[in-house]
Regions:
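Cell-wall glycan-active module
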Residues: 1-112, 127-134, 139, 154-228
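Extracytoplasmic ligand-binding site segments that recognize negatively charged/polar headgroups
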Residues: 140-153
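Conserved catalytic neighborhood of penicillin-recognizing serine enzymes
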Residues: 114-118, 122
Length: 228
C-alpha cells in the first residue's frame, strides 16, 4: 500500500502515518454491527434523538442567523439541512469519535469487504496528513469519519473549505465543517431554492451524504422542522 500511496502523490509524512497504523478491531466490530440503519423511520428518529436535535437546532440557528444565512447565500443549502446533519452526526460536536482516523481507514482498506470503497479515503487521509489538515494521532469515528459532520477523509480533502477565514481547513472547527458540508452538497448537485423532501429535487443529494434511506428521510424531516 505504501508504494501505491507514493504513486498517488503521498509524501513522507503521509507514508510515515501509514506505516504507524494498527489493525482496528473496534472499526471492524462497528462495520459489522450497523443496526440503527435497519430501524423503521419512527424508531430511528426516536433512537437518534430527533426531537432534541430539532430543539437545539432551532436555538443554534436563532443564535447565529448571519452565519447560516451566509452559507445558504454561498452554497444554496438551507440551515435546517446543515444543522440536522451536524446534530445527527456528532450531537453538534459533543462527540466526534475516539478511534485513530488513519488506522480506521487503513483497516477498512485492508478488509476485503469494501476495500475499493475505502482505498481512496485512505489516500485522502494520508494527503491530509501531508497537508497538515490532520496528524497521525487524529481521532474520529469508527469508520475514520472526522470532524463536526463526520467526513470521510477523501471527501474532506477534496471538498474542504476554510469557513472562518483563518487560512486553514480544519473539520474540527465548526465553521469549516459546516461550510465544507454545504460545499459538498452543492458540488453533488444541490439546487438552490428547490425542495429537499422525499420526491423533491434535492432529496437525491441527501442520498450522496448517506446511503441509508432511513437516514435520508430523517435529515429531510428534521431539516424542515428546524427551518420551519
Amino acid at each position: 500500500m505504501a508504494a501505491e500511496a507514493k504513486a498517488e502523490g503521498v509524501g513522507k509524512r503521509g507514508i510515515d502515518a501509514l506505516m504507524a497504523t494498527g489493525y482496528s478491531k473496534a472499526t471492524i466490530g462497528a462495520d459489522r454491527n450497523q443496526k440503527s440503519f435497519k430501524y423503521s423511520l419512527e424508531k430511528f428518529l426516536d433512537v437518534r434523538g430527533a426531537d432534541a436535535i430539532v430543539s437545539q437546532g432551532r436555538s443554534r440557528k436563532a443564535k447565529n442567523p448571519d452565519f447560516y444565512a451566509s452559507l445558504e447565500a454561498a452554497y444554496g443549502v438551507p440551515a435546517g439541512v446543515l444543522i440536522a446533519i451536524h446534530g445527527m452526526e456528532t450531537g453538534f460536536g459533543s462527540f466526534m469519535g475516539d478511534t485513530n482516523v488513519v488506522s480506521a481507514i487503513a483497516t477498512l482498506t485492508y478488509d476485503c469487504r469494501r476495500s475499493d470503497f475505502f482505498r481512496p479515503h485512505l489516500i485522502g487521509a494520508l494527503k491530509m496528513v501531508d497537508a497538515g489538515m490532520i496528524s497521525m494521532e487524529t481521532v474520529g469515528a469508527k469508520h475514520g469519519e472526522l470532524g463536526h459532520t463526520q467526513f470521510l477523509p477523501g471527501n474532506a480533502f477534496k471538498y474542504g473549505v476554510d469557513g472562518n477565514g483563518d487560512g486553514q481547513v480544519d473539520l474540527y472547527n465548526q465553521a469549516d465543517a459546516l461550510a465544507t458540508t454545504a460545499n459538498y452538497l452543492r458540488q453533488k448537485g444541490w439546487k438552490p431554492g428547490k425542495g429537499y423532501q422525499e420526491g423533491e429535487p434535492n432529496f437525491a443529494v441527501i442520498k450522496e451524504w448517506n446511503a441509508a434511506k432511513v437516514y435520508q428521510q430523517a435529515i429531510a424531516l428534521m431539516g424542515a422542522r428546524i427551518d420551519g
